[in-house]
UniProtKB/Swiss-Prot annotation:
It comes from Vibrio cholerae serotype O1 (strain ATCC 39315 / El Tor Inaba N16961). This is Ribose import ATP-binding protein RbsA. ATP binds at G38, E39, N40, G41, A42, G43, K44, S45. The gene is rbsA. Pfam families: ABC_tran. GO terms for molecular function: ABC-type D-ribose transporter activity; ATP binding; ATP hydrolysis activity. Residues 6-242, 252-495 form the ABC transporter domain. The lineage of its organism: Bacteria, Pseudomonadati, Pseudomonadota, Gammaproteobacteria, Vibrionales. Its EC number is 7.5.2.7. Keywords: ATP-binding, Cell inner membrane, Cell membrane, Membrane, Nucleotide-binding, Repeat, Sugar transport, Translocase, Transport. Gene3D superfamilies: P-loop containing nucleotide triphosphate hydrolases (3.40.50.300). It is a peripheral membrane protein. GO terms for cellular component: plasma membrane.
Amino acid sequence: MTQAILALSQIEKAFPGVKALDKASLNVYPGRVMALMGENGAGKSTLMKVLTGIYSKDAGSIEYQGQPVSFKGPRDSQLAGISIIHQELNLIPQLTIAENIFLGREMTSPFGRILWDEMHRKADQLLARLNVKHSAKTLLGELSLGEQQMVEIAKALSFESKVIIMDEPTDALTDTETESLFNVINELREQGCGIVYISHRLKEIFEICDDITVLRDGKFIGECRVCDTNEDGLIEMMVGRKLEEQYPRIAAQQGDISLEVIGLTGSGVHDVSFTLKKGEILGVSGLMGAGRTELMKVIYGALPSERGVINLNGRTVNPVSPQDGLANGIAYISEDRKGDGLVLGLSVKENMSLCALDQLSKGVQIRHADEVIAVDDFIRLFNIKTPSREQIIGNLSGGNQQKVAIAKGLMTKPKVLILDEPTRGVDVGAKKEIYQLINQFKAEGMSIILVSSEMPEVLGMSDRILVMHEGRISGEFMASEADQEKLMACAVGRNPAHAA
């Protein structure tokens, strides 16, 4: 194989109480796409932070273009030709697209005047490469989250880097945007650029990558070519064990109807009716923009309803706020755990008990002993990997953050649990643990709504499935009668069906 343009060898990094990297290695080759795989907490992000100078390494070596290097920070590595596209956007909504792309390195004349026309022209060229249909003069805040992600990618391309690291680049992208990104990756590959591609989406790995490096518990497990492995082999490398069944659906005794929605209309939702039983998992499928999240937020009280009826255990309720929804026994775990679900600057304990303070209080005093007992019980039950309940949640891996978000909802002892994209950005090992928790709630008789963009997840975990299209229910199936073709037909509004 060609000599690596970038080689990280035997990297070690320790934090108080944890060894994040233990002889981790990564090779990046010119003109090839290297997938960096591993469960959340495997050390992928830490390794990238060591590379770009955010963290200093305790041991090991980094060679770039055959020379040993040690970068002082992201700016230093970027100027050397190594760019990283983070999962969390590093952009300013109040500035234009062009201003964001060239922030801190504006094009100027010899007299210091900013060359706006030249900047806009260059930015427009970058946007065209990514098939973004906006002028470079557009304010970033006017773009969708997926379009903002494409601007972040355009910013990295503007450095004409020799190595580009993409951390979950398609997480917020539509299928069309993903296709545009893959076209650019192929273009960069042909130009000899080395690319590190970090993703939990195995389908993407086998579609766009050439090589794979796997980390587990901070250790280098192996490097192989994509053509020499398969999904089962890759999963086994990542988790250290075989996953015999990805979706461990269980049979459980279903009870009476707990939730009945009749003719519900609200923000992005039109005349929706359905029922949900105790001990049932109701999957909700559909394409981006179909109204799935809007429907859940109307039921929960985060978005207003215009008309319709919501009955909970035979009693009509009308949640007008999230607090109202919680008080009525409805818990909603947001698809955006970092935006809506968690406060990243607070501890695990503070996040977990945030919505249950009424239950944990006597008068105006929080019963701290009861709070600690409840939080510790959930940490143990959910196998949350954290040094302590006082750990700042922003320091946890994505999978452990998601477990805390779910525990936060369960602390309120809900009758109905709504899980919106519960495994988004979560590795395969943590997914399995979350599925097992969902099954446990189901076995205990809880009513669960599972909203997911991953059709295999909906098919594998649900007892019954609703499909949404343009704010309406376009199909309903028993899981045993559904398949991806039927769900997709309903999702695009081509074949409305009601098989349940």
